[in-house]
Amino acid sequence: MSIYLDNQAAKPVDVRVMAEMTLYFNEKFANPASLHCDGDIATDILEKSREQVANFINAPNSSDILFTSGATESNNLGVIGAARRLKKKGNHIIISEIEHISILNIGKYLEREGFRVSRVGVDRFGKIRLDKLERLITDETILISISTASNEVGTLQPTAEISKIAQEKGVLFHTDAVASESVIPIDVQEVPIDLITLSSNDIYGPRGVGALYLKKGVRVNPIIIGGGQERGMRSGSENVPGIVGFAKAAEITKKEMPQESEKLKILRDKLIKNVLDTIPKSHLNGHQEDRLPHNAHFRFDYIEGESLILTLKEHNIAAATGSACSSKTLEPSHTLIAMGLLHEEAHGSLLVSLGRTTRETDIDRLLEVLPDQVKRLRKLSPLTPSDLLKKYEEVK
């Protein structure tokens, strides 16, 4: 049986979520837009689900939640929709250099529409430089979009401070919270944020469902035109079974997050300590303390991350080198390059992301396999220095 340690890319659907969804596939399957009794039932469950997702982030009004097909659509609707709506006010948008690929490509798309997009830098741990962010804001700035945490190296961003800066400057603030939503609480009444991207699968719900939170008074131009569902901002018949699953996943995650996050942090810390202690020339990417409790992102000198993933695959261990959404390219991680790493350093990375089903025995097995596989690849690498090879020979 394989050991799954790629939870940042995809998570299994919780069995309790699947059980909740079943009824809405073949019994209560009507369209919420229909006027008959079955349509009323679908509308009721849709609005109940909206309330549950709103409660997940402590949103005061369930109408603040728009359902979408997932995080990429929510990012598009939030950033493109807000930018187009505010174009008469200004044409300047700020994102970070280490955003998810969907936000980076949205930035390029908006530049082709005539918007000016600035990309704020990060420090060597992947944390936003707040001083640089403030200096980038002008009278033309209408939107800041910065993720709550890096989906790759796991560094938590100073969301509260960014929110304060945005409020003081009268600029909308959008955050993609997908990387953190399963392990870090979101409270929009404690930290005011204008737009938030959420994903169902990242809290162990079904894929193909997401949401965009819009603070009261904030509106976006629709990017999908049709029947005017979701307050006229996101057309298309709602995916009721998926939304029911999303809502159940939100309910479970909110309740179990404190204990689950602590469990994951203990496993993560055990993994990090043992890897850094037992494998020479190994490094932790991202911030040591301000990081996601389920994220461990390493780099190993003198080897390729892709080769390491393939050797772990031989031992039925699933891990990654970085973001799944850009893993098919052989280019070095844009996040690691932005953090100041050289191309050859960025290529030697391994992302281990833990989840609800991760057990301590999974970590033990990885720690049993990983040192030998790193050693094996280094012996084959022309980059490995002779003194390290000699040490490996001495401990045979």
Model regions: which residues?
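Pyridoxal 5′-phosphate
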Residues: M1-K396
